[in-house]
Amino acid sequence: MLNLGRARTGRQNRSMSFEGLDFADPKKNNNYMGKIVLVMTLTAMCILLLNQSPTFNTPSVFSRSEPGVTHVLVTGGAGYIGSHAALRLLKDSYRVTIVDNLSRGNLGAVKILQQLFPEPGKLQFIYADLGDANAVNKIFSENAFDAVMHFAAVAYVGESTQFPLKYYHNITSNTLVVLETMAAHGVKTLIYSSTCATYGEPEKMPITEETPQVPINPYGKAKKMAEDIILDFSKNSIMAVMILRYFNVIGSDPEGRLGEAPRPELSEHGRISGACFDAARGIIPGLQIKGTDYKTVDGTCVRDYIDVTDLVDAHVKALEKAKPRKVGIFNVGTGKGSSVKEFVEACKKATGVDIKVDYLERRAGDYAEVYSDPRKIKEELNWTAKHTNLQESLKMAWRWQKLHRSGYGSSSLVSAY
């Protein structure tokens, strides 16, 4: 493309002397005039092309507002849960913008989504850090969002105790940036991804939405602080807010298109399902279960495991039910706990591998039982967990793991599904 601005500047700064022109020579004169005509013709053609170009003339489809809630910003949409949420939204005919800095997410997941939904105006990916307020403001300025699903966050309890400031910055501070920018640009719906870690060590089970929030680690504390900011802001705002506190997430897309692919350097902080799969694949020698003397059915900790497909369904239902000036807070779980021993046995059956297990002393800070009371979300959002067979959820996740041994490193659409 011609740099028209520079061409004009150069012509203005150059001294125009007529002494070198021989007007008495018609050949020289015609040659000079021909060059002028050629330059003028090329300039006119460039201007015409620029005016006709959709890049210059037509605004992006993502910058246009449409009736209703049609365009959703998914922060952290390249991550495990966020990518599954983006997939569901796209299947439900929403337009989706994913914003992710890829510190924990996978570009491969975005590429899969782009292959599945190649139509113009359906999906766009923007590489950005939510901690950069100027970048976030620019994104909101150039796009007409109807709602935000805010997943982006570091999310390992163990890591949060080692690097607490990282968690307060990434979760609490970044949520403040998102909320301020939403308010500045009139985006009126927020679906916030929170956690049962905000409850800490409840004295009574099951956990309801009224259970006191007394988090015991920086991850839970950072999430609760973010919740408090959102709730304080909502008191004098027309924003529709839904806060979903979910429990232990497992599983993967039933059609095998997406899965969980944490970075290897973070495996020590990862979910128990990841450790089980690593043991089944021989990446680690076996599992270490810490604590067999809890007051539970078999002495090991009891947790509520929610399939990612059900979790995403809860987010979509929350989006559909969100009302201006209203705040909804919901636990997202099955309402049933499974012990660590039960989980490991289900994983052995799902993988077909007799995983070696070592039993160690209990770890400080772990609590015996954590499971939800899902009655509120059932009554108000008409949501219930459907994928409650632990072995089946693990089997689906294992199938993806076997076909993607390097995660999304060599990801492609798998025809086996």
Curated annotation (Swiss-Prot):
Superkingdom of this protein's organism: Eukaryota
Disulfide bonds: none
Membrane-spanning segments: 32-54
Organism: Arabidopsis thaliana
Entry GO terms, CC: Golgi cisterna membrane
Lipid bilayer topology: Single-pass type II membrane protein
GO molecular function: UDP-arabinose 4-epimerase activity; UDP-glucose 4-epimerase activity
Family (UniProt): Belongs to the NAD(P)-dependent epimerase/dehydratase family.
Main location (coarse class): Golgi
Catalyzed reaction equations: UDP-beta-L-arabinopyranose = UDP-alpha-D-xylose
Keywords on record: Carbohydrate metabolism, Golgi apparatus, Isomerase, Membrane, NAD, Signal-anchor, Transmembrane, Transmembrane helix
Stored InterPro entries: NAD(P)-bd_dom, NAD(P)-bd_dom_sf, UDP_G4E
GO biological process, one term: embryo development ending in seed dormancy
Cytoplasmic compartment segments: 1-31
Active-site residues per Swiss-Prot or TrEMBL entry: Y219
EC numbers: 5.1.3.5
Residues in the Lumenal compartment per record: 55-417
NCBIfam families in alphabetical order: galE
UniProt-recorded name of the protein: Putative UDP-arabinose 4-epimerase 2
Compartments reported by the entry: Golgi apparatus, Golgi stack membrane
Pfam families per UniProt: GDP_Man_Dehyd
Co-factor requirement: NAD(+)
Residues that, per the record, bind NAD(+): 71-102
Pathway as given in its UniProt record: Nucleotide-sugar biosynthesis; UDP-L-arabinose biosynthesis; UDP-L-arabinose from UDP-alpha-D-xylose: step 1/1; Cell wall biogenesis; cell wall polysaccharide biosynthesis
